[in-house]
Curated annotation (Swiss-Prot):
<feature type="binding site">
    <location>
        <position position="65"/>
    </location>
    <ligand>
        <name>Ca(2+) 2</name>
    </ligand>
</feature>
<feature type="binding site">
    <location>
        <position position="23"/>
    </location>
    <ligand>
        <name>Ca(2+) 1</name>
    </ligand>
</feature>
<keyword id="KW-0479">Metal-binding</keyword>
<feature type="binding site">
    <location>
        <position position="133"/>
    </location>
    <ligand>
        <name>Ca(2+) 4</name>
    </ligand>
</feature>
<dbReference type="GO" id="GO:0005509">
    <property type="term" value="F:calcium ion binding"/>
</dbReference>
<feature type="binding site">
    <location>
        <position position="70"/>
    </location>
    <ligand>
        <name>Ca(2+) 2</name>
    </ligand>
</feature>
<dbReference type="Pfam" id="PF13499">
    <property type="entry name" value="EF-hand_7"/>
</dbReference>
<feature type="binding site">
    <location>
        <position position="108"/>
    </location>
    <ligand>
        <name>Ca(2+) 3</name>
    </ligand>
</feature>
<feature type="binding site">
    <location>
        <position position="135"/>
    </location>
    <ligand>
        <name>Ca(2+) 4</name>
    </ligand>
</feature>
<feature type="binding site">
    <location>
        <position position="25"/>
    </location>
    <ligand>
        <name>Ca(2+) 1</name>
    </ligand>
</feature>
<feature type="binding site">
    <location>
        <position position="103"/>
    </location>
    <ligand>
        <name>Ca(2+) 3</name>
    </ligand>
</feature>
<feature type="domain" description="EF-hand 3">
    <location>
        <begin position="84"/>
        <end position="119"/>
    </location>
</feature>
<feature type="binding site">
    <location>
        <position position="144"/>
    </location>
    <ligand>
        <name>Ca(2+) 4</name>
    </ligand>
</feature>
<dbReference type="InterPro" id="IPR011992">
    <property type="entry name" value="EF-hand-dom_pair"/>
</dbReference>
<dbReference type="InterPro" id="IPR050230">
    <property type="entry name" value="CALM/Myosin/TropC-like"/>
</dbReference>
<feature type="domain" description="EF-hand 4">
    <location>
        <begin position="120"/>
        <end position="152"/>
    </location>
</feature>
<feature type="binding site">
    <location>
        <position position="97"/>
    </location>
    <ligand>
        <name>Ca(2+) 3</name>
    </ligand>
</feature>
Amino acid sequence: MAAQLLFTDEEVTEFKRRFKNKDTDKSKSITAEELGEFFKSTGKSYTDKQIDKMISDVDTDESGTIDFSEMLMGIAEQMVKWTWKEEHYTKAFDDMDKDGNGSLSPQELREALSASKPPMKRKKIKAIIQKADANKDGKIDREEFMKLIKSC
């Protein structure tokens, strides 16, 4: 299975364990009902329509259920999407880092966020800096920026 090449043996074993936990009727596939119950157990709730969409997005054999290989492929696709987003956010950081020193000064951040429509107010920008500036150096480095983006 092609998706397995993207994961370590330990990751595949963990995914199998989780898959088996979701497959409450032991049919080797996850139904919409099982997926819904799983999400409820994690404190998340989705409509039947949302769950059906999740299944149809990865149900390559159109069985109406998700087997292990389909689940693994779905996870792989999400990882690829996140990688693209991370590259996109890295480029955004580089574009805002006008002096190229690897961190965003309050001025660089203000310039970037003030150009947004509608422009962001100084008070909001200051709050963003305070939230993101983990090492309290008054700037946002690449790692802090990525953590901020992922928390949104």
